[in-house]
A protein has these predicted regions:
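Basic side chains
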Residues: 28, 48, 125-128, 135
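Acidic-residue sensor for enzyme active/binding pockets
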Residues: 18, 34, 136
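Short, conserved glycine- and acidic-residue-centered signature motifs
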Residues: 16, 44, 48, 133
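A Rossmann-like FAD-binding core segment of flavoenzymes
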Residues: 1-5, 25-110
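An active-site-proximal "capping" alpha-helix that borders the catalytic cofactor pocket
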Residues: 132-144
């Protein structure tokens, strides 16, 4: 995928924040839009300080808009609303949607009849970080 020079990322969780940093390191101008009060809230306490320091080092390339909600995506960027209700238009060559995950429980449960040892693990139960999902997979395997 060709990423333009001016990027808007909708969703300031760990994935969106890391994407913003990576693109900034590639010289892109990035605007990170997060509806919550802070970015990378789902990062662990060891990783987050280093991530935030890196973001600070790339402050010229990354603009962070917290308490801002994306209300529409168009060919040339997004429309969003800030905490005061002010509508903003953010121009971009590329829009990346990193606004969270929803577990696909129904798809996972459709596999239950295949085995008497069926276990749901990882993101099909609830979205989370890879270390938790791998540990849960290991625990399920040890039960079999």
């Amino acid at each position: 995928v060709q990423v333009g020079q001016k990027v808007v990322i909708v969703g300031g969780g760990l994935a969106g924040t890391e994407a913003a940093l990576e693109l900034a390191m590639q010289g892109k101008q990035v605007t990170l839009v997060e509806m919550g009060i802070d970015v990378a809230r789902d990062a662990n306490s060891i990783h987050k300080p280093a991530l935030m320091m890196e973001l600070k080092d790339h402050a010229e390339q990354v603009t962070i808009l917290c308490r801002t909600t994306c209300t529409g995506i168009h060919d040339h960027g997004i429309v969003c609303r800030d905490a005061d209700g002010k509508e903003l238009t953010l121009d971009a060559d590329t829009v990346i949607l990193a606004a969270g995950m929803v577990p696909l429980r129904a798809e996972a449960l459709a596999l239950e009849p295949v085995s008497s040892e069926f276990r749901m693990v990882g993101d099909c139960k609830r979205p989370r970080q890879i270390l938790e999902a791998v540990r849960e997979g290991y625990d399920a395997a040890m039960e079999v």
